[in-house]
Every structure is written in C-alpha cells, then in structure tokens.
C-alpha cells in the first residue's frame, strides 16, 4: 500500500471470516500501545459548584492519564501512530503524549523521525523503549476482500481486536496522490493510529479515521 511505502517500511485474496491464531495475540499485544497524556496535578480553573465527576465512567475518573489514541512498534525502536493523535496533544494543558503498555508502564517519546500531515502518520522513537522491543511483521502487498483486524484502544478502554474485510482502495480526495484503504472492521474513538492486520497478523496499514455514515473506515 502507498501508506506503508510512505512510512519508509519494507503497503489479501477472498477469504471467509477467520480468527487470528491465539499464539499471535501476545506478540500483537506487546507491540500495541495506548497513546496517553498525564492529567494535570491540579485544575487551574475554578467552578461555581462542584463538578459531577461521579457521572464519568470509573476508569476515566480514576485514571491518571487521558487515553487519546493507539500506536504500535515496527522494530528497532520505531513506533507509528496517526499524525492527528500527536497533534491533538500539542500545546495542551495535559502532559506530552506518551505510550502506555498493557501493564500500565509509560514510555516518553524520544524523537520524531517522519511526519506527514496529508497522509496522517508519524514515525517516532521512545526515549527508553521497552525491553524486547516487540514489533509487527509487515505485509506490503495486501489483496482486496481478505479478512483484516483493526487493533486499537477503542473508546479508551484498552487494546481490543475487531475483524472485518479490506473492501476497497479510495483515491485521496484532493488530487488522488495516493489511495486510502477502506475496511469494514469496527473503529471507535481511540482506534486512531492503531495497526490494521491481515489474517496472519502482519501489518498492512494504519487505522486513521472512521466513516461518519457507514462502517467503512480508512487506513
């Protein structure tokens, strides 16, 4: 896919729905992270009356971090997320964007290596990557109509995997400079920046945006 080529990485035939091999799941989980920002220690604003914080979900009101997206490892201390996920954290009252693994360990971002506003991706390093530096294998020639899996931090509730089909390629709207991948696996707020995997657990794209009117999403 053009998107994977644009990342500088090494982009499915018709298939019926199939589950990922359970043996792949620990590796996928180890290579997938939440993008988080630390909540401020104190609220700089004052309010006329106490806020009804008890109406927020328990996880949201007790977590010390805001969960804003998903990222994943591609090896050699290189990580990928959607460009708009990191941009959302710029000039924020919250802490800088960081990665959090399934065990709750948080890793500060080191250096931005590549960034594309148009294609909406960023490649970066971590200041101190996790031990083992787990990475997803890459498939650069996916075929249409195969089962795919959207991996992400859906709704900020932790990393989940949802299946669908890689349905079509859609030209970029302004001048068709590249093609977006469209897929039917469910995508929710927080999925942005997560990996789109084929049936073998290999990376074929980056989940970027949800279609407003139908369950055909973009990578």
Residue locations for each model-derived region?
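Bacterial N-terminal signal peptides
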Residues: 1-10
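Sec/Tat signal peptide C-region and signal peptidase I cleavage site
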Residues: 12-17
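A conserved glycine-rich beta-strand in the N-terminal activation segment of trypsin-fold
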Residues: 19-23, 45-48, 52-82, 107-108, ...
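Flexible, gly/ser-rich surface segments that form the specificity/activation loops bordering the active-site cleft
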Residues: 20-23, 88-89, 133-179, 187-191, ...
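Catalytic-histidine neighborhood of serine endopeptidases
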Residues: 65-68, 74-119, 129, 144
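Catalytic nucleophile loop of clan PA
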Residues: 72, 186-207
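Short, solvent-exposed secondary-structure boundary/capping segments
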Residues: 119-126, 173-182
């Amino acid at each position: 896919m053009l998107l994977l080529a644009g990342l500088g990485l090494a982009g499915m035939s018709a298939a019926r729905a199939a589950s990922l091999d359970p043996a792949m799941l620990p590796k996928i989980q180890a290579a997938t992270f939440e993008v988080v920002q630390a909540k401020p220690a104190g609220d700089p604003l004052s309010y006329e009356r106490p806020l009804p914080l008890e109406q927020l979900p328990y996880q949201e009101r007790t977590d010390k971090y805001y969960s804003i997206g998903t990222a994943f490892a591609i090896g050699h201390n290189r990580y990928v997320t959607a460009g708009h996920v990191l941009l959302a954290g710029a000039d924020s009252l919250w802490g800088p964007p960081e990665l959090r693994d399934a065990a709750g360990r948080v890793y500060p971002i080191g250096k931005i290596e590549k960034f594309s506003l148009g294609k909406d991706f960023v490649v970066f390093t971590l200041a101190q990557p996790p031990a083992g530096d787990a990475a997803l294998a890459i498939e650069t020639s996916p075929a249409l109509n195969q089962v795919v899996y959207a991996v992400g931090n859906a709704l900020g509730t932790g990393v989940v995997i949802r299946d669908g089909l890689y349905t079509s390629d859609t030209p970029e709207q302004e001048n068709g400079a590249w093609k977006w991948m469209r897929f039917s696996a469910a995508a929710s707020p927080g999925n942005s920046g997560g990996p789109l995997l084929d049936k073998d657990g290999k990376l074929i794209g980056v989940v970027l945006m949800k279609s407003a009117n139908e369950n055909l999403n973009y990578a």
